Amino acid sequence: MKKTALYNKHVELGAKMVPFAGFDMPVQYAGVTEEHFAVREKAGMFDVSHMGQFIIEGPGAKDLLQYVTTNDLNTLTDGKAQYSCLPNGQGGIVDDLIIYKMADEVYFVVVNASNIEKDWNHISKFNEKFGAKMTNISDETSLIAIQGPLATQILQKLTSTNLSEIPYYHFTIGTVDGVQDVIISNTGYTGSGGFEIYFKNENAEQLWNALTEAGKEEGLVPCGLAARDTLRLEKGFCLYGNDIDDSTSPLEAGLGWITKLGKGDFVDAEFFKKQKEEGVSRKLVGFELLDKGVPRHDYPVVDAEGNVIGKVTSGTSSPMKKIGLGLAYVKTEFSKPESAIFIQIRNKNIPAKVVKTPFV
């Protein structure tokens, strides 16, 4: 089991540790609900160093990434980041990822922890044609996400970089608490604003401690993966392995906005064009339960007659809305907001309705 550079810190803070994507990770500290509300109302701090990072550079870098991802790299300028996904050649998704343009011909790519090796092999296979230089820096890179309405003012205490000048999905390289060459990125997976900072492992404890100290007055709390999941779900963000995977297309998953069919040739471009013309037979939708219950991954979705029309991909009891809600693939005819559906929970069909995301 791998450990992040902050493992000892989590143990010292009394975090409950669980195996996740080959890492021993903190699932919670004080408690999921408390951590969730801290991020929505004040600020929370997450160790997400298990994520993967690649540097892809050189004359072939842009063409390689433009070919293996769905989004359009032509819209990326230095200091800008882009959400995208890797199609698998059969219309499914290898992974979703964020691409940071560091400079001309230099890209920093962030992938999901569970897919580091898979993504590396997938991109490498196509790189035989493009000849870009690829470096996997996952093992020496740490990542802290500081999220919530007060996150920016906490981080600002530790850096001379003017954070208010970094728009959403933009980044800069700066100094934080004296640590140089930190990637300071206005991104996150909570929908509550804030930053993600990338740096070398040896600076992890220093920066964690500095943030803890800087955020005392604002009520900053350490948060685990469980709160990260309830936070992202309330915003309707996809989780790889649940809501998207090798069997789901970006168009089915509501990721048409990052699938730029007019950008030129790329993996599965023809498949997606055809799928767009013909329409998809199922769609990923948000739903809310109308009765008590907690929907979970893989629970069947049925219609009024009890016919299976889909399945739940992610579900929870929402701390903010105090109801069961989630994401599910349903037959397209049931995908319109307000459509009546039922979630099968312990052999009971619980009434639910399709809603637009975000939920909060």
Task: Enumerate the language-model features and the residues they cover.
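A glycine-rich (often HGG/GG-containing) alpha/beta subdomain
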Residues: 45, 56-103, 135, 143-189
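Helix N-cap motif at beta-to-alpha junctions
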Residues: 59, 112-117, 149-152, 200-205, ...
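Glycine-rich, acidic
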Residues: 3-7, 18, 24, 127, ...
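Well-ordered alpha/beta subsegment
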Residues: 100, 105-108, 112, 117, ...
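Glycine-rich, small/acidic residue-mixed loop/short-helix segments
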Residues: 248, 253-360
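Hydrophobic side chains in well-ordered alpha-helices
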Residues: 64-65, 119-123, 154-155, 207-211, ...
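Acidic, proline/glycine-enriched N-terminal capping motif
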Residues: 1-84, 92-94, 226
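A generic structural motif
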Residues: 107-109, 195-197, 323-330
